[in-house]
Curated annotation (Swiss-Prot):
Region Domain I: start-end pairs: 1-63
GO CC field: cytoplasm; Holliday junction helicase complex; Holliday junction resolvase complex
Protein name: Holliday junction branch migration complex subunit RuvA
Organism of this sequence: Enterococcus faecalis (strain ATCC 700802 / V583)
UniProt record similarity statement: Belongs to the RuvA family.
Main location: cytoplasm
Region (Flexible linker) residue spans: 144-152
Region of interest (Domain III), ranges: 153-204
Domain observations: Has three domains with a flexible linker between the domains II and III and assumes an 'L' shape. Domain III is highly mobile and contacts RuvB.
Amino acid sequence: MYEYIIGKVTFVSPYYIVVETNGIGYQISVDNPYRYSGKMDTDIKLYLHQVVREDAQLLFGFGSLEEKQLFLKLISVSGIGPKSGLAIMASVADHGGLINAIEGEDVTYLTKFPGVGKKTAQQMILDLKGKLGELESSEAAVAAMTATEAVTTSNQALAEALEALSALGYSDREIKRITKQLEALGETTTDVYLSNALKFMMKR
């Protein structure tokens, strides 16, 4: 079982990043791959969670130990798998908002996450309420990882962001509903498009 990895980012896709260390490239699923676009060929440290299946061995990466702990709490809930847990974490810039929703039993807020219905939201509250307070300090680490990549062409960056939303589990209908809002941002980076898209999704 892996605890963390330190290596260079060599590839970024809507679904995962590749981190190379000692001549081996590790495919790692992260909540927002484009956060690492500005880290290409730079050493980073990710805390890892490994999922072993009959047909695959999957790695999920997190910028801080607190993020990893939050992810493990989420996937302990019946109905939330690793992909859903990662999508939930990607959908909120402030994980404190997620924690507050659970503590406040805000089912409406929780059902805004992709793949989370009323039953799963209620299960999240039942299983996690009162158990997440120690994780609220994780946001500083998330903010520190914000990429400073050069601006790519608007169409390419926007297309990458929309593809990343699809990878997180949002439907075509949901994505189309916020596309005009993203276009109104003008030319910017994929990470900025995606971060704003996730905020728009949570406000719908």
